[in-house]
């Protein structure tokens, strides 16, 4: 659309929305956001952590610390930040809504496509066909478009499961609050936490190996299973985990 081409976006859900949790944004993505004019809008909602840390989840020992300061910016030319997926999604959505060349269409699933020689014909779930110069498959991990082109089958489960949750700043004890992105590395586990939305929220991600899962990215996780994998770890880790009553499970 920035080059003058009309664009139609087909979304199979009833509305455009994002219900995930935190996401880390490195210099590469900020280079793209800068190019399309959204960098500052994204940074307005984001948190700029002073550093990334990795600690041993059993001993508490600091393994490494990577400052994300002026030297980092000078080296890579762009910042590092963390933000809520819903905030990032809203910024991009609002930019699309403000462009007359972009038409957003909900309740529309792309089931397939054909190469017409000088363009492409997409078949929608309601049976209608749409002509265009090009088709960009942005339909995620379970992509129909990718499967049609590459033929690589269904995604393979890695054995890693991520449990996600978000806390309000007021629900995090002061002695557990850290402005950094912190990763606690344990036996076949890791636990990550960092602030979101200018420090108003706190993002938690607990990852472990398990054969017990449901396909998808938003099922409810088992607290009992989580504790089986994280028992014996540092009090800081366990105290943070116990503050969450409901986890959302994300199979990797």
Label each PLM-derived region with a short phrase.
Residues 26-168, 211-227:
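Conserved N-terminal helical subregion
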Residues 115-116, 194-196:
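Short beta-strand micro-motifs enriched in acidic
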Residues 161-194:
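Flavin-dependent oxidoreductases
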Residues 5, 38, 235:
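Short phosphate-binding/catalytic loops that engage adenosine nucleotides
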Residues 1-21:
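Glycine-rich FAD pyrophosphate-binding loop
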């Amino acid at each position: 659309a920035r080059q003058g081409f009309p664009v139609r976006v087909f979304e199979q859900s009833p509305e455009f929305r994002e219900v995930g949790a935190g996401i880390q944004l490195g210099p590469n993505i900020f280079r793209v956001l800068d190019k399309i004019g959204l960098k500052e809008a994204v940074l307005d909602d984001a948190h700029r952590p002073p550093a990334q840390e990795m600690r041993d989840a059993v001993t508490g020992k600091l393994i490494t610390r990577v400052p994300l300061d002026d030297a980092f910016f000078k080296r890579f030319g762009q910042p590092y930040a963390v933000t809520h997926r819903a905030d990032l999604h809203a910024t991009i959505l609002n930019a699309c809504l403000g462009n007359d060349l972009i038409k957003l269409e909900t309740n529309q699933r792309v089931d397939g496509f054909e190469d017409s020689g000088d363009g492409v014909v997409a078949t929608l779930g309601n049976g209608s066909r749409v002509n265009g110069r090009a088709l960009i498959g942005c339909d995620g991990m379970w992509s129909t478009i990718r499967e049609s082109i590459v033929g690589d089958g269904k995604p393979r489960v890695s054995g890693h499961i991520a449990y996600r949750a978000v806390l309000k700043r007021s629900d995090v004890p002061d002695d557990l609050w850290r402005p950094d992105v912190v990763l606690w590395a344990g036996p076949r586990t890791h636990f990550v936490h960092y602030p979101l939305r200018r420090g108003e929220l706190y993002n938690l991600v607990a990852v472990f190996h398990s054969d017990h899962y449901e396909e998808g990215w938003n099922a409810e996780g088992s607290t009992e299973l989580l504790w089986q994998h994280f028992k014996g770890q540092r009090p800081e880790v366990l105290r943070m985990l116990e503050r969450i009553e409901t986890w959302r499970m994300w199979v990797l």
